[in-house]
């Protein structure tokens, strides 16, 4: 059943069009047969940039959507009826080592946007640098409300934008700080 229109019949398509009224980072997912469709990958992220290109300007802007799947060993098809017992954690539907590195230059101002459409929270941790949370589901955070962090918790259905200056050269880990998630690709 549809929320604002009739459901889309199997095998048919529908183009969603809307006016992006405010800048920010947003997630989407279905509201019909939600768990099955999300288990098959029907979810995503989009960024609406501000009209003023100088507002909240950064040199590098990365976006990650956290997903979780239940897939039997040797299989490629997720179990679509799993509600909480997931065994594969992904970033933009990719598992380590298939995740591209976040490449930046020394001195770059870097933003990383993380959206969580899994069924658990993820304490996202950055090695080698401190960051501030500059954005949430509600929009940009006021500069006076920010403080240095190395880990931020991204709860179910939430989005966080973090920013830092790349001051220390090298390869630095960026991961979920739940040990059993890092053992399985996150």
Which stretches of residues belong to each language-model region?
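Copper-binding active sites and cupredoxin-like electron-transfer domains
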Residues: 1-186
């Amino acid at each position: 059943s549809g929320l604002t229109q009739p459901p889309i019949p199997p095998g048919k398509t529908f183009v969603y069009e809307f006016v992006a009224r405010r800048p920010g980072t947003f997630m989407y997912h279905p509201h019909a047969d939600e768990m099955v469709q999300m288990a098959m990958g029907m979810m995503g992220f989009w960024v609406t940039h501000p009209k003023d290109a100088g507002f909240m300007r950064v040199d590098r802007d990365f976006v990650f959507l956290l997903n979780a799947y239940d897939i039997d060993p040797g299989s490629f098809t997720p179990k679509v009826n799993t509600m909480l017992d997931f065994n594969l954690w992904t970033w933009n539907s990719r598992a380590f080592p298939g995740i591209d590195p976040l490449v930046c230059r020394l001195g770059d101002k870097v933003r990383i946007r993380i959206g969580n459409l899994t069924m658990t929270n993820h304490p996202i941790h950055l090695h080698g640098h401190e960051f501030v949370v500059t954005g949430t589901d509600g929009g940009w955070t006021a500069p006076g409300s920010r403080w240095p962090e190395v880990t931020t918790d991204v709860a179910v259905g939430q989005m966080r934008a973090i920013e830092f200056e790349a001051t220390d050269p090298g390869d630095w880990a960026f991961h979920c700080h739940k040990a059993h998630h890092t053992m399985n690709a996150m």
